[in-house]
Amino acid sequence: MISFNTSTRHTFKIVVSTDSSVQMTEEQKKNYFNTGNLNDIQVDDKASWFTLRTLSIADREQAEIKAGAFTRSELGKLLWVEAPNDTRDKALWHNRLSDEEKEALAKYEKYLDRSYLEYAKASLVAINDEEVNSDILDNLSPADKSNVIYEMVIHLTRESTLSESGK
């Protein structure tokens, strides 16, 4: 059973694996994403530390509404769920979609990207212990923005949801 953390007062710190001041193997990265544990990972003094707060169910719903939950493509959502996991199979599957289906899928994927950005903005408290306005994420380069948001959401999801043993 999985349940959401009901407290939004819990904060935690992360570093982003693509930060040049952070050195980790793929196995260490996988473990870090799953546990948040930085043991055996080399983190230089120049690394950027992000302080995040957990999000309640209401916070997550509000972020999804801001991202367009009521106008997202339901056909796109259905196709996204049905898409194969294997890269080659997915490419072949995607190629067989009609133009209308491809457009619906693209719209849904854009909605997911907006949702992740809204989750990240709602959870960001500080960078390097300095309080920041969450709009600072909009100032990142596109490549950095994608990586930072993706990793923030991985850690945020882990910290905002508790397994039965985590209660």
Predicted regions and their residues:
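Short, intrinsically disordered N-terminal pre-domain segments
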Residues: 1-17
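Intrinsic disorder/low-complexity segments
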Residues: 19-21
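Short, surface-exposed, charged amphipathic helix/loop patches that serve as local interaction elements
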Residues: 23-167
